[in-house]
Amino acid sequence: MNKVTLLHEGKAKKVWQTDNPDLIIQEFKDDATAFNNKKKGSIADKGVTNNAIASRLFTMLGENGIPTHFVGKLNDRDMLCKKLDILLIEVVTRNIAAGSLVRRYGFKEGTVLSKPIVELYLKNDELDDPLMNEDHAVALGLGTCEEVAHLKAMAKKINSLLVPWFAERKLRLVDFKLEFGRHKGEILLGDEISPDTCRFWDAESGEKLDKDRFRLDLGGVEDAYSEVKRRVLEQ
C-alpha cells in the first residue's frame, strides 16, 4: 500500500491517502504537544511506540465487537486504516479524578469515581476544545441525537473492556480520549489509543506513565511510554 497524497498533518500524526480511495495511512510522529499546542517538544521513538500500542489495542477491541478504523500495522510508524469522515467530537471517559476534572470541580486527584464520567468536547483548537453537552453537539450539526448517544454508549463499552485489560497488566486507566468517524454509513472508532490519549498510572506505585510526564515536566517520558508498550505487548 503506497502513500499517494498528504491529506493532513496534525500534532502527532500525518494522514496519507493511499491508492485505495477507502484507505488511508496514519504515520505516527515523535512530536509532542500539550495544552492545545502551546507546549511543544519531541519524545524519542514516540511514533514507533504509539503505533505498536494502538495497533494492539485496536486489535483487541475489534476482537471484542468494537468497530474500528484499524486495518493493519504496516511497519514501525505506519498504520493502515479505513478512511473516516471524522466527527468533530472528542469523547473523554474518566474513571479516576485527574487533570481538568480536578481543576474544574475540586475533586482530589486520585479519587476513584463512583461511576465513569463521559464528557464531550468540541474538537476545535482555536476554541481550546471546549466542554459541551449533547444539545450543543446536535445544535452545532456534529451529529444526530441518536449518533451522540451512540458515541457515549460506545465509549462506555470500550471503557468496560479496557479497564480490566489494563488492570491485568498492572496499569490503572485513569481517563482517555476517543475520536470517531463515519465510514460507509457506520460509526467507527478512529484516531489512536496510546499514552498520548490516555492517562495511565502504575497500579502499585501510582507513577504516571503517560503524556502528563511531558505536560508537567516530570522527566522520564521515553521510559514511561516504553514501559506501557512493554506491558501492552505482553501476551
UniProtKB/Swiss-Prot annotation:
GO BP annotations of the record are:
'de novo' IMP biosynthetic process; cobalamin biosynthetic process
Q: What is its EC number?
A: 6.3.2.6
For the keyword Nucleotide-binding, the answer is yes
- One Pfam family here: SAICAR_synt
Q: In which pathway does it act?
A: Purine metabolism; IMP biosynthesis via de novo pathway; 5-amino-1-(5-phospho-D-ribosyl)imidazole-4-carboxamide from 5-amino-1-(5-phospho-D-ribosyl)imidazole-4-carboxylate: step 1/2
Residues in a coiled coil are none
Catalytic reaction equation(s): 5-amino-1-(5-phospho-D-ribosyl)imidazole-4-carboxylate + L-aspartate + ATP = (2S)-2-[5-amino-1-(5-phospho-beta-D-ribosyl)imidazole-4-carboxamido]succinate + ADP + phosphate + 2 H(+)
Q: Which keywords annotate this record?
A: ATP-binding, Ligase, Nucleotide-binding, Purine biosynthesis
Superkingdom, natural source: Bacteria
Q: State the InterPro entries in the record.
A: SAICAR_synt/ADE2_N, SAICAR_synt_PurC, SAICAR_synth, SAICAR_synthetase, SAICAR_synthetase_CS
Q: What class of enzyme is it?
A: ligase
Q: Which GO terms describe its molecular function?
A: ATP binding; phosphoribosylaminoimidazolesuccinocarboxamide synthase activity
HAMAP family in alphabetical order = SAICAR_synth (MF_00137)
The family annotation for this protein states: Belongs to the SAICAR synthetase family.
Per its record, how is this protein called by name?
Answer: Phosphoribosylaminoimidazole-succinocarboxamide synthase
Q: Which gene encodes it?
A: purC
